[in-house]
Amino acid sequence: MCDPENPQPMEMIHIEEPTLSMNFMVNTSPFAGQAGKYVTSRHIRDRLAKELEVNVGLLVEETDSTDSFKVSGRGELHLSILIENMRREGYELAVSKPEVIIKRGADGRKLEPVEEVAINVPDEYSGTVISKLNRRKGIMVQMSGENGFSRLEYHVPTRGLLGYRTEFINDTHGEGSMERRFFDFERWLDRKSVV
């Protein structure tokens, strides 16, 4: 809505690029058909097409197999919410483990997504958290402390954060908080192990 005498377009909203992908497949396990009523690839395809109409951060691609779709999203939470919603709606599907989306830069080098991670944790657990994030190839950007809590800010490759939330909750006995958001695609460093 705007003044008819002075119509001004709204600024375009920047949508972050997908950083993780998973394959959504027809369930072919021995227990197939027992957990849902929508079990065919046609059902899965139609549901994903419906999701694309409202979920602007999602990307769905066909694969070589007619029973599988490559679904890309903005992180573990984004994709897990979609999976859980589909299961609650009666869709039965199998999913692959998440894979980080790798891009090529202008010079042809591999680029990987890096996330900005902000952590608030009691001082007694900060050493463990710092150690684990360093092993996951995180780079500390800032550290501060106040009233017995440490605030840690890191840049960590997305592949280093896969599965880390549960470990973080266990390490901090549920007393820490962690916020993540996409930072940038940065040059892939030849890291032997991220975890």
Label every PLM stretch briefly.
Residues 1-195:
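Accessory interaction regions appended to the cores of large information-processing enzymes
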